[in-house]
Swiss-Prot record:
N6-carboxylysine found at: 226
Pathway linked to the protein: Cell wall biogenesis; peptidoglycan biosynthesis
Enzyme class: ligase
This protein's name: UDP-N-acetylmuramoyl-L-alanyl-D-glutamate--2,6-diaminopimelate ligase
Residues that hold UDP-N-acetyl-alpha-D-muramoyl-L-alanyl-D-glutamate according to the record: 32, 159-160, 186, 192, 194
Cross-referenced InterPro entries: Mur-like_cat_sf, Mur_ligase_C, Mur_ligase_C_dom_sf, Mur_ligase_cen, Mur_ligase_N, MurE/MurF_N, UDP-N-AcMur-Glu-dNH2Pim_ligase
Annotated meso-2,6-diaminopimelate binding sites: 401, 425-428, 476, 480
GO MF annotation, one: ATP binding
Source organism of this protein record: Prochlorococcus marinus (strain NATL1A)
EC numbers for this chain: 6.3.2.13
Gene Ontology, cellular component aspect: cytoplasm
Record NCBIfam families: murE, PRK00139.1-2, PRK00139.1-4
Length: 509
């Protein structure tokens, strides 16, 4: 795809200065080192370095023009003869809309659904992709684990891709025949305008609990970032285009603001916002391998069987089906497909369950991505429902991240687990022992606890210690296959470590 510079500038409401050339643009690039001939260089403003200062190197490498911020132009001033456009504000504010226009506004050609919240985004997005595909609608998935569409799949580097590659991926998905798209939308992405230029047909608010307070100043700031998906990026019309979890305090606030532009959903039949939630569950029965019950929507009621474990997954299921019913898909067809959902890697993943049974004498081992206090609590409660004896929890906290949540996660583990093994997660530049000390501040003195900074040894210890009918929950990393130690990233997979520990174990009955 190609466009001309002047056309793109007008698309973001910028006047074209006199004498500026109007070259044909072959592609967009934010990295001066990866420029190819005919590319338009976009000088992205970074936390430490303003990429716009490298405009001259981009031109040398073949860029037909560069767009930079005023700040970058002061650090490395261009002349009037240079093919450089100077923006009054950071380039990131314009990048999403510019990229969307360059790629022909691909999101407007599909039903794009955004999912935001602290926990539940990945499972909900996987559900949406699976259900729409099962009903014969080719779908795309953009999120924490993978980006994929028909005949293409790649491992994700970010929960939400940056604006320029995101629009390119959307165009490729449209070219592959996609009708629906499920996109995880992080608070970082919303704060950094990565989804500017995306037209969302629908949006889901899963929940909000403590996370990323190293980036956001407060829970209020964190909420404002999440809420911007519903205020600024949804297609604006009179009908409801969102589904909001009102069992969550912040969700209730958002639902009251959106009013009739949203459907409320709750695991309770009564609502403080409306007489009844728009989406809710009744006649719930817990089974060994999931749940069954009735799902209520404004468009009808249907019986469901869900293979997902944990009450929090009932909310994920309710929201995924709710948004698709809201967008016009038939409820009964969605509920029929639900029973075949294969689950999500690293999300309440049962490592050694075979035909709903665990080898005699062995514990059940579960790997989950839970890395926030709320997420850990949900995973522990779900794991408790599967154990007949002790619940053992292995977890740590990431380094160079929100330190305030560490003691809270220790407090949660002490409250809901019978035995705790505190270990490392991704310590990054911090000392693992110091992180563990922060976690221990929230753990009561009478708790049964072991400390082992080496994560592989901690997993092996917990599984060796567990007995028949115990459950071992390994929390924090889920699908991740790496560990970050100082400046080194090593291969590490909790699921592989768990299987190895199980194979080394002698029967303890």
């Amino acid at each position: 795809m190609s466009r001309y510079l002047h056309t793109l500038l007008k698309a973001i409401d910028l006047q074209v200065r006199s004498g500026l050339a109007n070259p044909e643009i072959k592609n967009l690039s934010t990295d001066s080192r990866e420029i190819e001939k005919g590319d338009l260089f976009l000088g992205l403003d970074g936390e430490k370095v303003d990429g716009g200062t490298f405009w001259a190197k981009a031109i040398e490498r073949g860029a037909c023009a560069a767009i930079i911020s005023k700040k970058a132009s002061l650090l490395n001033p261009p002349t009037n003869e240079d093919p450089v456009v100077i923006l009054p504000e950071p380039v990131s504010l314009f990048m999403g809309k510019l990229a969307a226009d360059f790629w022909g506004k691909p999101s407007s050609e599909i039903c794009l659904i955004g999912i935001t919240g602290t926990n539940g985004k990945t499972t909900t997005s996987f559900l949406i992709e699976f259900l729409t595909t099962s009903l014969g609608h080719p779908s795309a998935l953009f999120g924490t684990l993978i980006n994929r569409w028909p005949n293409y799949e790649e491992t994700s580097k970010y929960t939400t891709t940056f604006a320029v590659p995101l629009q390119a991926k959307l165009r490729k998905a449209v070219q592959a025949g996609v009708e629906y798209g499920a996109m995880e939308v992080s608070s970082h992405a919303l704060s950094q305008n990565r989804v500017a230029g995306c037209d969302f047909n629908g949006a889901i608010f899963t929940n909000l609990s403590r996370d990323h307070l190293d980036y956001h100043d407060s829970m209020e700031s964190y909420f404002e970032a999440k809420a911007s998906l519903f205020r600024s990026h949804l297609i604006d019309d009179d009908g409801p285009r969102s589904v909001i979890n009102i069992d969550d305090k912040w969700g209730s606030i958002l639902a009251k603001e959106l009013n009739k532009k949203c459907w409320t959903c709750s695991l309770k039949e009564n609502s403080q916002i409306r007489e009844k939630p728009d989406l809710y569950i009744s006649n719930l029965q817990i089974m060994q391998d999931g749940y069954m019950g009735k799902l209520h929507t404004p468009f009808g009621v249907g019986n469901f069987i869900s293979p997902l474990i944990g009450e929090f997954n009932l909310m994920n299921m309710l929201q995924a089906i709710g948004i698709l019913v809201q967008r016009g898909l038939p409820l009964n067809d969605l509920l029929e497909a639900l029973n075949k959902f294969p689950g999500v890697p690293g999300r309440m993943q049962l490592i050694n369950m075979d035909g709903f049974k665990v080898k005699d004498g062995y514990p059940l081992v579960i790997v989950d991505y839970a890395h926030t206090p709320d997420g850990l609590q949900n995973a522990l409660i779900a794991s408790r429902s599967l154990t007949k004896k002790r619940l053992i929890c292995v977890f740590g906290c990431g380094g160079d991240r929100d330190k305030g949540k560490r003691s809270k996660m220790g407090e949660v583990a002490a409250k809901f687990a019978d035995y705790i093994v505190v270990t490392s997660d991704n310590p990054r530049q911090e000392d693992p022992i110091e992180i563990i000390k922060d976690i221990q501040k929230g753990i009561t003195i009478d708790s049964e606890i072991s400390v082992e900074p080496e994560r592989s040894i901690a997993i092996q210890f917990a599984i060796a210690k567990a007995k028949k009918n115990d459950v071992v929950l390994i929390a924090g990393k889920g699908h991740e296959d790496y560990q970050i130690l100082k400046d080194q990233t090593i291969y590490f997979d909790d699921r592989e470590q768990a299987r190895k520990a199980l194979s080394l174990r002698t029967d303890v009955i």
